[in-house]
């Protein structure tokens, strides 16, 4: 009886092992097919598209450099991109509202305005620049925000981040931006650089890379104040620009 029981147990174990191996073999056979089906599904779902993107000259467009290069060399997975660089946000907004652009890099405050104006049809995807604004001077008289009192500052970006950041910092440092300083607004940052180069201005509000460009052209031009650090000194936190 014990002998028969041993044979029965051995037979059961053998049958179980056979079914186990068969199941493993079936799973191994199915795995490549499943992977192939997933790959085919992904290929079927991907449809190359043409995208029209606009950005402002300067730091706003710097984040697009790699995409521009990849698009030019055909390394963008089949998608095609058309890029437009503008001098001011006013040049971008109409095209964006008309649907002539798929994406645009604009000042943060304008992004909020566009979101509300289109009732959410235009959405914010990302913030791609932080801490790029500087006060530059051809001289040594500006060592703090307080030293800007009585100065003329050439700047670009009226109605957007540069203006709001500058006015806030001036006000918080006891300087009335409407009466204690003169802000000469230009339409583009390149005009500020030209004013510095010609000697028409000695102090300017500039973002990178215009600061570096200006320093390469104008001997003695220095970064007098880092607005990121000035904001941090007041608020105790990093600014979101």
Residue ranges and their predicted role:
Residues 53-57, 150-161, 173, 178, ...:
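Short beta-strand->loop
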Residues 44-45, 137-153:
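Flexible hinge/capping segments at coil-to-helix
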Residues 66-68, 133-143, 235-241:
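A bilobed periplasmic-binding-protein/Venus flytrap-type ligand-binding module shared by bacterial periplasmic
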Residues 25-27:
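Bacterial signal peptide processing site
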Residues 42, 50-51, 56-86, 90-91, ...:
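Short, polar/charged alpha-helical segment
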Residues 109-110, 118, 183-184, 190-241:
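Pocket-lining segment of extracytoplasmic ligand-binding domains
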Residues 80-87, 105, 177-188:
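Short beta-strand-to-loop elements that line the ligand-binding cleft
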Residues 19-23:
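C-terminal motif of bacterial Sec signal peptides marking the signal peptidase cleavage site
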């Amino acid at each position: 009886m014990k002998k028969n029981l041993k044979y029965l147990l051995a037979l059961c174990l053998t049958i179980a092992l056979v079914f186990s191996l068969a199941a493993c073999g079936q799973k191994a056979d199915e795995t490549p097919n499943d992977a192939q089906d997933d790959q085919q599904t992904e290929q079927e779902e991907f449809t190359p598209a043409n995208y029209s993107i606009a950005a402002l000259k300067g730091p706003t467009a710097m984040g697009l450099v790699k995409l521009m290069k990849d698009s030019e060399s055909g390394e963008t997975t089949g998608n095609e991109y058309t890029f437009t660089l503008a001098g001011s946000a006013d040049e971008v907004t109409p095209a964006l509202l008309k649907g002539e652009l798929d994406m645009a890099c604009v000042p943060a405050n304008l992004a909020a305005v566009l979101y509300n104006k289109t009732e959410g049809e235009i959405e914010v995807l990302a913030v791609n620049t932080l801490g790029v604004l500087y006060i530059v001077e051809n001289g040594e008289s500006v060592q703090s925000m307080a030293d800007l009192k009585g100065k003329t500052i050439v700047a670009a970006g009226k109605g957007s981040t540069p203006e709001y950041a500058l006015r806030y910092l001036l006000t918080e440092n006891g300087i009335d931006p409407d009466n204690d300083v003169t802000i000469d607004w230009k339409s583009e940052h390149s005009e500020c650089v030209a004013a510095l180069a010609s000697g028409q201005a000695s102090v300017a509000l500039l973002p990178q890379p215009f600061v570096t460009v200006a320093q390469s052209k104008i001997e003695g031009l220095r970064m007098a104040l880092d607005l990121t650090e000035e904001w941090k000194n007041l608020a105790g936190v990093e600014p979101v620009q």
